UniProtKB/Swiss-Prot annotation:
Its main location: membrane. Disulfide bonds join 96-174. It comes from Bos taurus. It is found in: Cell membrane. Is a receptor for the SMIM20 derived peptides Phoenixin-14 and Phoenixin-20. It mediates the Phoenixin-14 and Phoenixin-20 augmentation of gonadotropin-releasing hormone (GNRH) signaling in the hypothalamus and pituitary gland. In the ovary, it mediates the effects of Phoenixin-14 and Phoenixin-20 induced granulosa cell proliferation during follicular growth. It is a multi-pass membrane protein. The keyword Isomerase does not apply. Keywords: Cell membrane, Disulfide bond, G-protein coupled receptor, Glycoprotein, Membrane, Receptor, Transducer, Transmembrane, Transmembrane helix. Glycans are attached at residues 3, 184. This is Probable G-protein coupled receptor 173. GO terms for biological process: negative regulation of neuron migration.
Length: 373
């Protein structure tokens, strides 16, 4: 057996039955794996299958779902095996580095991706015309590739022992070995993760401030129409005089309201943001912020434990706190589908369409034509 903690241990051929704590860990992690794999698979299939979801926000959501699903399928089985073998690593040192690399890769990928999503949410509300014109499929692909490239750049150096990947017995996983900061190589990685999370929430704070400033509407000021020959033109005109003139009831010259009836081609081509689109963008913003907030809440205890190891040398992290923090970070891989189906009406509608038996009363029956008498 290869144990990368530096303390070789031997595992007997017959496995001892797991303790109550290990049994709880196995059950919880197994449940997290099932929910993550099923939820992310369903959400990914919906985004791929339904044309109504072929939009930039859902492409980013698809990338997050695929990353969480791969993390659950690749990394979590090794954690289950280590718990089953009494918090021991029974595989090679190379496999430990590979699993640790993938775990850190998916963590940083989620952080980078959530930051990019927060920027696109701000652009969708504050600069919608630019967003609608520039946020194409290829732009989304470029953003996703950039997030993966930055994640690889953050997770790859420890493979060459720049910040060491080792099996941490207290965490039952292969991950960064966080030591005291005077002999530590991982402080920079933790600072980068903290800066990313802070920057993401700063962008959402700016978006909230923008919406608050633009939610106040000016009161309607009634401007009287101007008329010298009963044509009634000007800012307060309703166009009724022009309609009367067209119908043959007008007298005198053509009303000024008809002189500018031909619109400017550039102004006509400018796309305005309707109320339905505003509500849709705000709904997507709330959903992605809920995902970001849960990412922060579920990873914060583990990040606090990492900083504790780096800056506090005299006192070790309590074992129960560390175990809870690690399993909370595992649970983050399963929460995204739940949040999306709870907060997104479009995803609920698509789910009912493709799985009518899950909806209330099945698929809606086609309406018969009728006439109002």
């Amino acid at each position: 057996m290869a144990n990368t903690t530096g303390e070789p241990e031997e595992v007997s051929g017959a496995l001892s039955p797991p303790s109550a704590v290990a049994y709880v860990k196995l059950v919880l992690l197994g449940l997290i794996m099932c929910v993550s794999l099923a939820g992310n698979a369903i959400l990914s299939l919906l985004v791929l299958k339904d044309r109504a979801l072929h939009k930039a926000p859902y492409y980013f959501l698809l990338d997050l779902c695929l990353a969480d699903g791969i993390r659950s399928a690749v990394c979590f089985p090794f954690v289950l095996a280590s718990v089953r073998h009494g918090s021991s690593w029974t595989f090679s040192a190379l496999s430990c580095k590979i699993v640790a690399f993938m775990a850190v890769l998916f963590c940083f990928h989620a952080a980078f991706m959530l930051f990019c999503i927060s920027v696109t949410r701000y652009m969708a509300i504050a600069h919608h015309r630019f967003y609608a014109k520039r946020m194409t499929l290829w732009t989304c692909a470029a953003v996703i590739c950039m997030a993966w490239t930055l994640s690889v750049a953050m997770a790859f150096p420890p493979v060459f022992d720049v910040g060491t990947y080792k099996f941490i017995r207290e965490e039952d996983q292969c991950i960064f070995e966080h030591r005291y900061f005077k002999a530590n190589d991982t402080l920079g990685f933790m600072l980068m993760l903290a800066v990313l999370m802070a920057a993401t929430h700063a962008v959402y704070g700016k978006l909230l401030l923008f919406e608050y400033r633009h939610r106040k509407m000016k009161p309607v000021q009634m401007v009287p129409a101007i008329s010298q020959n009963w044509t009634f033109h000007g800012p307060g005109a309703t166009g009724q005089a022009a309609a009367n003139w067209i119908a043959g009831f007008g007298r005198g010259p053509m009303p000024p309201t008809l002189l500018g009836i031909r619109q400017n081609g550039h102004a006509a081509s400018r796309r305005l943001l309707g109320m339905d689109e505003v509500k849709g963008e705000k709904q997507l913003g709330r959903m992605f912020y809920a995902i970001t907030l849960l990412f922060l809440l579920l990873w914060s205890p583990y990040i606090v434990a990492c900083y504790w190891r780096v800056f506090v040398k005299a006192c070790a992290v309590p074992h129960r706190y560390l175990a809870t923090a690690v399993w909370m970070s595992f649970a983050q891989a399963a929460v995204n589908p739940i949040v999306c189906f709870l907060l997104n009406k479009d995803l609920k509608k698509c789910l009912r369409t493709h799985a009518p038996c899950w909806g209330t009363g099945g698929a809606p029956a086609p309406r018969e034509p009728y006439c109002v008498m």
